[in-house]
Amino acid sequence: MKKIYFILLLFPFFIFSQEPLKKSEKILYKNERCLGVNLHSLGWGMHGRRTWNDNVRWQHFLEFDIASLKHPKQIKTINTFFSNAKGYDYGKLNSTFILRSGFGKQFLLFDKPDFGGIHITAIGSAGVTFAFLKPIYLEILYQDDITNEFYIETEKYNPNDPNHTPYSIFGRASYFTGLNQMQLQVGGYLKVGLNFEYAKKDHVIRSIETGVIADAFKIGENDFLKNGIGKELQIMSLTKNKNNFFTFYININYFFGKKW
């Protein structure tokens, strides 16, 4: 009987001593990297990020974005007089894509519970933006004066050329035509957003990030570099071009993200 009392007295201590084993301790990973798709209101591309954990709440990172950039009034058209004509953007001077490279901070708002869920962080970053502008080349229709047959010449689009009208443009030329005439303009960007990470495994990154980006290609009132900074991005003719852009973005990371 005394043995039974003794066991009953020790039973509560035995229960409490086992309780910590029920709690799952999450690993704080020091490093992260991800590569994914970038969609924004004026184009699309890809993005990447390398992150270091400072503590439980704060992280810092280096990032890059590579994406196309369209003019808001850019509209694709086609010469309806020819069934095999190619689509093109009438009035487009340059095909433009941008490369962003910058530094940012990330702050934890809501962590995942032990049973899963969504990890939510606020992000902010800034850096340099490089805009690459490749001139547009088109296939132009001409008619032989003697045979009256049509033939095609590949020419750089010129809005002042009387032959470069919707009636005489057959379509776009190869994208690679004009690569050797590409121009570079330099600016900067600011980005703010929210990141929603939902992977079931802690060492995997699967996330959706959404926010806004401001790109500016004018620094001060005077151009201190005459070869790019301060100029408008000449994307379209026949309409006003801008040197600053405000876009909404979504980054999708699914396959190429990990923590260690």
What are these regions (language model features)?
Residues 123-209, 213-241, 254-260:
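Outer-membrane beta-barrel transmembrane domain signature
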Residues 1-22, 246, 252-254, 259-260:
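Bacterial Sec-dependent N-terminal signal peptides
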